[in-house]
Amino acid sequence: DSMPMAKAEAEIDRGIAADETAVYGQVRVTPATPFFRFPGFASNPALLNRMAERGIVVFGADVWASDWEPMGPDQELRLILSRIEKVGRGIVLFHDTKSQTAQMVPAFLRELKKRGYRIVHVVPAGGNAR
């Protein structure tokens, strides 16, 4: 089932507004950090075009930690590192509401550095990020 365009845009706007309010204390017409990931990567060409028209960059992921599955931080670390090694680079998806992920991230960052990977800080064009 696909959601009607107007409803999808309204849900996107609510999500962006919630993020803007939580991070910056206000909602702006153009988000301070104009990045978006569709839940479940469930986009379509019309929504992607609309986001581009609004100047919002849509991200996907190359590897994910499957952190929605029950597992401990050590198991999650082994899983995500094995997936990164297979592809060699890319955007990693974590869910920040998962406690095992929060516990695992420091070890993950140390291991990436040890293996020669680097973290890239993505900022909006024009330097809008605060």
Q: Could you describe each region identified by the protein language model?
A:
Residues D1-Q26, A42-G88, T101-M104:
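Alpha-helical scaffold elements lining the catalytic groove of polysaccharide deacetylases
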Residues G40, T97-K98:
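Short coil/turn segments
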Residues D13-A17, I91, E111-G116:
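A broadly tuned preference for mixed-charge, low-complexity surface segments
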Residues S99-R130:
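C-terminal domain-boundary segment and adjacent tail
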Residues Q26-A32:
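Short helix-terminating capping/connector loops at secondary-structure junctions
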Residues P34-F38, V57-D62, G90-F94, I119-V122:
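Structural recognition of the beta-strand scaffold that forms the well-ordered cores
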